[in-house]
Regions:
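Amphipathic alpha-helical coiled-coil segments
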Residues: 72-87, 97-109
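Low-complexity, glycine/proline/serine-enriched intrinsically disordered segments
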Residues: 17-34, 93, 101-256
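Extracytoplasmic/periplasmic/luminal assembly and interaction segments
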Residues: 59-79
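Short, charged, amphipathic alpha-helical segments
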Residues: 59-66, 85-93
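N-terminal signal-anchor transmembrane alpha helix of single-pass membrane proteins
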Residues: 1-23
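Amphipathic, heptad-repeat alpha-helical segments
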Residues: 20-64
Length: 256
């Protein structure tokens, strides 16, 4: 009977040891992820407070960078897991893309390369200017900033769907960013803006199902006699102009 007690004791000790090691590993991963996110967030903060906008495009980009800086700081403060800390880093990286956009809009050196954002590699990018009529108003996409296209997006997923990197006359993705869901009419605008554009080599169905350029590597469902059954809908929706965030005062110049 005593050997059963020994086995139980050994098992309990082993379990406690493994749990302690797991807790140490989890704590170490969290600490490393927090440190990594903090470096990126501090880098973003330095740029937010050093740059001053010179035109509408840079003002919008700096406002978005400031919003991402505040959001990343809040996420980092609340991060109790490595995954949440990595999310804070992603938010800060988004902010750095907006900093890069602001510098580009002011004809400054955009600075060093920035790590790719989640979903950015499948979203594509605007590589030619295009203006379409949507719900009685013109909507423009362009590869470069201008007074007509002051709203930048770095490329990536919004509410599960890919949005190409580029400059736009209005932030047509922002309602989905705020609400976490897309209006059905967005597919109509996506088709009009990007159909046939080389930099966005995927169709509306790939936009709706969130696969983007990744769909190019997937087998066609028709080859297997399958009907994907997507219905884009016809809700015209609307996006309400090009309002950005009010970031407060930006002061000074400074390098990247």
């Amino acid at each position: 009977m005593w050997w059963l007690i020994v086995i139980v004791v050994v098992c309990v000790v082993a379990l406690l040891y493994l749990r302690a090691e797991q807790n140490k590993r989890t704590a170490r991963e969290l600490e490393e992820a927090q440190a990594d996110a903090r470096v990126t967030t501090e880098r973003l903060g330095g740029q937010v407070y050093q740059l001053s906008p010179r035109n509408e495009a840079s003002r919008q980009a700096l406002a978005d960078a400031s919003e991402r800086y505040n959001a990343a700081g809040g996420q980092l403060d609340r991060a109790d897991s490595a995954a949440k800390a990595r999310l804070a880093k992603q938010t800060a990286l988004e902010g750095l893309y907006y900093i890069r956009a602001a510098r580009t809009a002011m004809d400054m050196d955009p600075g060093p390369p920035i790590p790719t954002l989640d979903g950015q590699d499948i979203a594509g990018q605007v590589d030619q200017p295009r203006t379409v009529n949507h719900n009685g108003r013109p909507v423009t996409a362009a590869p470069t900033p201008s007074p007509l296209t002051p709203n930048y997006f770095p490329g990536g997923r919004v509410a599960g769907r890919p949005v190409p990197a580029g400059w736009y006359s209005e932030p047509w993705w922002k309602p989905a960013l705020v609400a976490g869901a897309w209006g059905a009419g967005t597919a109509i605008l996506f088709t009009a803006l990007f159909a046939g554009m080389p930099g966005v080599p995927y169709d509306t169905q790939a936009f709706e199902d969130g696969t983007g350029e990744a769909a190019l590597d997937q087998p066609n469902p028709d080859d297997f006699g399958q009907d994907p059954g997507y219905d884009a809908g016809q809700d015209p929706g609307g996006w309400g102009g090009s309002e950005g965030f009010d970031s407060g005062g930006f002061d000074g110049g400074g390098g990247f």
